[in-house]
Amino acid sequence: LNCTETSFMTGDLRLRAVEHFYDFHPISAQQIFDAVAARGIAREHITEEVLQRHDQDHYGGTAAVDRLMGEAGVTAADRVLDICSGLGGPARYLAWKAGCQVTGLDLTASRVEGATALTEAAGLADMVQFRQGNALALPFADAAFTLAISQEAFAHIPDKPALVAGIARVLQPGGRLVFSDILSRERLGADDARRLFDGMRFSEIATEADYRGWLHAAGMHVVSATDLSEEWTRILVERHAMYRSLREQTVARLGLEHFERYDQAYEHFVGLYRSGVLAGALFHVRRNG
């Protein structure tokens, strides 16, 4: 799905494009299993500690999850929802480290299947489960969770007012939402917005002020918002270099055209961080009541 007229795309079409994007993402469950095997570790000997080197497909690895856990004050009593859980690295890490129950939700069936396979291999299937579903129509009962988390995923989702309203519904009163996301410092120009969607499937990138308004309207309040822009700029430069280092594997699995298209998109994305157009933050939010 390569849609240049992104301003005319409906929310459903945007979500379909995101789903397709992650079906062909260079990091997959098979790639992780292959990396573990290359270390000489048999599948039956996989543990959470083994996977941590490979399965944290977000900015900052386990250190970022530790920071999120510190903000949230995660305990074994928490019922955690990981929204846009991908291959499940943070969900497994939370359950392993805090002893809590975690439910991961992701739009893309192949990510849910991969997350489930990795979780079973790590022996954590009794603590972590994954479901396919739409974050704009959360398939959970009211007040089902004490904590919701997400990392650099809401940028993919259109209609963020509906997103945060749905999260507020499934949190119990006083429940926490702790998430990091890609932000714009000011409203993005049309060309940058189009290129970010076409290349990275980022949809309607928000400002910090946007989020504060939407969260307030949904009956939540921001406890803190930590600026991560400088740290992420450094990380993104490193991730782009890592992607290029996987050229041979990516071309073999997805083809040269796919590799080059994603490489160009990532170069544009990193450039917007280096120039200060894009930013990032970790939000700690509470549901009122």
Language-model segment annotations:
Residues 79-137:
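Class I SAM-dependent methyltransferase SAM/SAH-binding core
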Residues 2-38:
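N-terminal auxiliary segments of SAM/dcSAM-dependent transferases
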Residues 182-202:
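Short, glycine-/aromatic-enriched active-site segment of Class I SAM-dependent methyltransferases
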Residues 136-147:
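A short acidic, Gly/Pro-enriched loop at the edge of an enzyme's catalytic core
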Residues 204-219:
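Short alpha-helix
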Residues 226-289:
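Conserved Class I S-adenosyl-L-methionine
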Residues 161-176:
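A short glycine-rich, Lys/Arg-flanked "PGG" loop and its adjoining helix->strand segment in the class I
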Residues 41-45, 58-78:
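Conserved alpha-helix/loop element of class I SAM-dependent methyltransferases that forms part
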